[in-house]
Amino acid sequence: MNFVPQLPRQVALILLLQFTNSLGVSALVPMMSFFIVEGLKAEPWQIGLYSGLVMPLTLAVNRWAGERLDNHFPVKRLLIVSVLAYITLSALLTQVTSLLILLVLIAPLMSLSNMGAGVVFTFGRLYAEQQGMDVARVNSWLRMMVSLAWMIGPAVSFSVVARFGFVSAFLSAFGIGIVYLTLWYIVIPSGFRSTRERRKTTGREPINWGLQIAGLTCLGFVITNSLFVSAMPLFFVHETGLPGATPGLSLSVKCLLEVFVIFGSVRLAERIGTRQVLMLAACLAAISMVLFAQVTALWQALAISVLEGVYYGLFAGVAISFVQSYAPDRPGRATAVYMNSLFLGGMIGSVSMGFIASATSFQTVLYTAAFSAVTALFVLIATLKVQPKAVDGSV
């Protein structure tokens, strides 16, 4: 971790901005299903109404934000939309008493809040380019901030709920929002925007198949992770009979390894190539899922969690740079494709897990997760000839 003192002040502030954004989002997003059932006393199936509304709105908003950034819209003016949406929804959640209000007010605000990470990722890339910095390394640092925040946010949020209630948790999120607003004001220069010139096209813009394939590859990894995380607690405790602390310990080991591997993934990519790193990650993902399906003891689960942390750290460290490389003159759109693959993959994994487990078993869910990783590997191999575009290439 000796890279921290070497960071320029502005880069360190951008990382802090991303950490604060992710901390705030992670403090609310995982808790919403729990709040719907326990706080609003709604039926569990009604969680799907909320998720089914937030997800498409988030995908659309991410795409919209990416287009604005690529069209030289000021980063600061765009990000304030996300910041204010987060602060407003945190305050409103302290007063929400019905599912209808949640769907009408909170869901749209949550989608606007969710676009913040993508905007900061694009901001970090644009700043790195304009300063002549290593873009892949800056991307990995930004992704590391997201992982660190998600290690902290949900745990703290659920702890506050358990001890003080939902209102206190939402007020804590509101406090994070105020810090987020302060950093927005300090970190982002008022006139900062993309300086890239886009190639002029006549008629309808052609489809960037390389970018779509890169996004599809990320989708396979995220579905693998989402299927496993959704099924893991019930598989370990109910189907396998492991101690109740196993899921939490396993996740802690995975997250710890993930953070360190993210930092090293860029160096590995410099040696063997980004696509090769993703191919290695896909192999490790498939192997770890199959091994998890065979565990019978706590030590086995923790040992395989090390492998899981390595695969996900490799993926997380290079994925955004891999996607952005297929649209170098459209970093906003590329980042939107990356972020949408995360949201969409998470939704597909969590929803399909329930259907698969109900029809078969949680062990089958893990085998399905392995299959998703193999699919990502197949896409990477089958598209070896689809190379990233040059900076001045067409979109």
Please place each PLM-identified region on the residue numbering.
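Central cavity-lining transmembrane alpha-helices of secondary-active solute carriers
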Residues: L49-E67, S252-G264
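Helix-to-loop junctions at the C-terminal end of transmembrane segments
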Residues: V61-P74, V161, V261-G273, A357
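C-terminal transmembrane helical hairpin of 12-TM major facilitator-type secondary transporters
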Residues: R275-A319
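A late C-terminal transmembrane helix in Major Facilitator Superfamily
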Residues: D329-A359
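Structural signature of the two symmetry-related core transmembrane helices
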Residues: R77-A91, F174, Q276-L291
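Hydrophobic core of transmembrane alpha-helices in multi-pass small-molecule transporters
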Residues: F19, L100-G116, L219, Q300-L314
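Helix-loop boundary and gating motifs at the non-cytosolic
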Residues: N2-M55, N225-E239
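Cytoplasmic helix-loop-helix junction between adjacent transmembrane helices
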Residues: L109-M144
